[in-house]
Amino acid sequence: MTTVIQRRSTSNVWEQFCEWVTSTDNRLYIGWFGVLMIPTLLTATTCFIIAFIGAPPVDIDGIREPVSGSLLYGNNIITGAVVPSSAAIGLHFYPIWEAASLDEWLYNGGPYQLIVLHFLIGVFCYMGREWELSYRLGMRPWIAVAYSAPVAAATAVFLIYPIGQGSFSDGMPLGISGTFNFMLVFQAEHNILMHPFHQLGVAGVFGGALFSAMHGSLVTSSLIRETSEEESQNLGYKFGQEEETYNIVAAHGYFGRLIFQYASFNNSRSLHFFLAAWPVIGIWFTALGISIMAFNLNGFNFNQSIVDSNGRVVGTWADVLNRANLGMEVMHERNAHNFPLDLAAVEVAPAVRG
């Protein structure tokens, strides 16, 4: 008779779950942040799809004039959007159970809050998951730091700006044309083009695109040939190979002669840090600028700052921007008020003299 003695498993279900969640052997890493990220992003995505297709019109301005945003109510992919919550709701937390009925919740734009708040929690957790996986693999945390730039930008337009303006109705609509409308209104009310933080963001995005194109083209132009003329040079690279796949000395020499010597990096590590840091810092500044303008600390205003010897205004580009801002503000919420605040603040003579 043979007796087989097996060691009793000491791990319970919770320990097995913890091991599975934190295991780096999974095809997709879950992580503790992923435990919260997955349901929140699924909720936001599901609600967005349903609302984009079939949500009824929303009384965004709080004046009983609903605005349609879904496909089934006359929009297409370009004009469709999830319309922000009503100005009548303001900054109040507005879950489904706070409304008297589902129809009221939809009429006041409840789906917008549901989507935005779940989405922000989800992207915060995605950033934490990036750090968590880097930690498990013994990597440095800069991937999560870089991702913090778009997270900060999304937080600025979806949360900080509505808080500063006093209502979720001022948040960015969830759609293509809604995004452009948000940009135009933001320019009209805050003169963002004349804000130095936005200008730093433009330099970061366009500069990052330029540097990325320059780096990619230099590397591609200085590959070390490992193949014949009839084969693609891409076949000369083997995943995980120890030797360099391109000649950094040749790329450095080319670029140094094209511009000047010190414009070219001779250190691959500092080069790639620069490529990551430039756009990230620029987008950080943009998010910070939007957060500042949310509380009406706006861009520079040089309106009528130059006059000639006779006191006549010498028109500048700033004056062109100011006129454009007034025009855009007149078009914005045209049924809520007849004139922008700049014009409505002018003292008007009484219509009836007593």
From Swiss-Prot:
Positions that bind Fe cation: 215, 272
What is annotated about its quaternary structure and interactions?
PSII is composed of 1 copy each of membrane proteins PsbA, PsbB, PsbC, PsbD, PsbE, PsbF, PsbH, PsbI, PsbJ, PsbK, PsbL, PsbM, PsbT, PsbX, PsbY, PsbZ, Psb30/Ycf12, peripheral proteins PsbO, CyanoQ (PsbQ), PsbU, PsbV and a large number of cofactors. It forms dimeric complexes.
This protein's membrane topology, according to the annotation, is: Multi-pass membrane protein
Misc. comment = Cyanobacteria usually contain more than 2 copies of the psbA gene.
Q: Where is pheophytin a annotated to bind? A: 126
Q: Locate the residues binding a quinone.
A: 215, 264-265
Which reaction does this chain catalyze?
2 a plastoquinone + 4 hnu + 2 H2O = 2 a plastoquinol + O2
Per UniProt, [CaMn4O5] cluster binds at: 170, 189, 332-333, 342, 344
Its annotated function is as follows: Photosystem II (PSII) is a light-driven water:plastoquinone oxidoreductase that uses light energy to abstract electrons from H(2)O, generating O(2) and a proton gradient subsequently used for ATP formation. It consists of a core antenna complex that captures photons, and an electron transfer chain that converts photonic excitation into a charge separation. The D1/D2 (PsbA/PsbD) reaction center heterodimer binds P680, the primary electron donor of PSII as well as several subsequent electron acceptors.
Q: What is this protein called?
A: Photosystem II protein D1 3
Q: Where is this site: Cleavage?
A: 344-345
User: InterPro entries per the record?
Assistant: D1/D2, Photo_II_D1/D2_sf, Photo_RC_L/M, Photo_RC_L/M_CS, PSII_D1
Q: Does the keyword Electron transport apply?
A: yes
